[in-house]
Swiss-Prot record:
GO terms for biological process: tRNA threonylcarbamoyladenosine modification. This is tRNA N6-adenosine threonylcarbamoyltransferase. Required for the formation of a threonylcarbamoyl group on adenosine at position 37 (t(6)A37) in tRNAs that read codons beginning with adenine. Is involved in the transfer of the threonylcarbamoyl moiety of threonylcarbamoyl-AMP (TC-AMP) to the N6 group of A37, together with TsaE and TsaB. TsaD likely plays a direct catalytic role in this reaction. Its cofactor is Fe(2+). It is an enzyme of class 2 (transferase). It comes from Geobacter sp. (strain M21). Substrate binds at residues 133-137, 166, 179, 183, 272. InterPro entries: ATPase_NBD, Gcp-like_dom, KAE1/TsaD, TsaD.
Length: 342
């Protein structure tokens, strides 16, 4: 099956053609980073307008790079949520138009589900597995028993990890996207220079909290303004170390509690070099089978949307033309989709 997938949940306009939910024939991404960098973060209205400007181009390029026309496409998958409502609607509208015009089946896909399954585009992972989804809007731990079968084990109670990276970066004068800037500076810094707190590390749950850590950085900079200049590398490394330690140890606790020794780490923050290293060291020391997609598949893309899209379309699970954006869409609710179909 050839699936044309579209993604427009935040600030990346993307389209991809994927065969049988595993082989990427094309993956085109139009980034808006340079546009939003001026504002220090994503501006929803601007994001929607940029999606409108780019969506036709990325679809055309995806088809051209794959060497196929719309007449060869068997189905269309589109990110339905979670994300920015206006941004989501751009991709959804185009997907509906293509599906209607070509009489193709259409299915709305959960963006986070796409992240968790992106790894299947590079190597198969056996179910069940524990998954850590870390991005600008999410820091969640899941038990994954199959496509469409997810159990939330823990989640952020305030800021997501990616959000914390961006806010701290802005606080210390670094450009957007903050995670990339902090990762780059941290390479030359001492992660033990500043002892920042590790929120909720020993609370007995699998939940996360990064708001207090952000406040701790603000307090430190207020007391030591020189940290934003001469000590900025140490500051970046120390903050990053705190985030990575919490993410790794909470994930390790979930693995230990469930006894499932297969782990997937996904989402934009999974591009972070320190987090990848921390997870790899933990997995190697504890006999855990670790899978982290390549950075291109950790960042927002449409190829990952085709993985669950292909599966649902193959089952005959489709969406009607009343498909609407779901800015909030918990993964746990996806099981209802399969139950209703069966």
């Amino acid at each position: 099956m050839l699936v044309l997938a579209l993604e427009s949940s935040c600030d990346e306009t993307a389209a991809a053609v994927v065969k049988d939910g595993r082989t990427v024939l094309s993956s085109i991404v139009a980034s808006q980073i340079s546009v939003h960098a001026e504002y220090g973060g994503v501006v929803p209205e601007i994001a929607s307008r940029k999606h409108l400007e780019s969506v036709s181009f990325v679809v055309e390029q995806a088809l051209a790079e794959a060497g196929v026309g719309l007449d060869r496409i068997d189905g269309i998958a589109v990110t339905q949520g979670p994300g920015l409502a206006g941004a989501l609607l751009v991709g959804i509208s185009v997907a509906k138009g293509l599906a209607f015009g070509r009489s193709l089946p259409l299915v709305g896909v959960n963006h986070i589900e796409g992240h968790l399954l992106a790894v299947f585009l590079e190597a198969p992972v056996q179910f069940p597995f524990i998954a850590l989804a870390v991005s600008g809007g999410h820091s969640h731990l899941y038990r994954v028993d199959g496509i469409g079968r997810y159990q939330t084990l823990g989640q952020t109670v305030d800021d997501a990890a990616g959000e914390a990276f961006d806010k701290v970066a802005k606080l210390i004068g670094l450009p957007y996207p903050g995670g990339v800037a902090i990762d780059r500076l941290a390479v030359s810094g001492d992660p033990k220079a500043i002892k920042f707190p590790r929120p909720l590390l020993h609370d007995g749950t699998f939940n996360f909290s990064f708001s207090g850590l952000k406040t701790a950085v603000l307090t430190h900079v207020g007391k030591h303004p020189e940290a934003k200049e001469a000590g900025i590398n140490d500051l970046a490394a120390s903050f990053q170390a705190a985030v990575c330690e919490v993410l790794t140890k909470k994930t390790a606790a979930a693995v230990a509690a469930t006894g499932i020794k297969r782990l997937v780490v996904a989402g934009g923050v999974a591009c972070n070099s320190a987090l990848r290293r921390s997870m790899a060291e933990y997995a190697a020391a504890n006999g855990v089978e670790l899978s982290i997609p390549s950075p291109a598949l950790c960042a927002d893309n449409a190829a990952m949307i085709a993985v669950p899209g292909d599966y649902y379309l193959g089952l005959g699970v489709t969406s009607g033309f009343d498909l609407d954006a779901l800015p909030v869409w918990p993964l746990d609710k996806l099981a209802l989709r399969l139950k209703e179909h069966c």
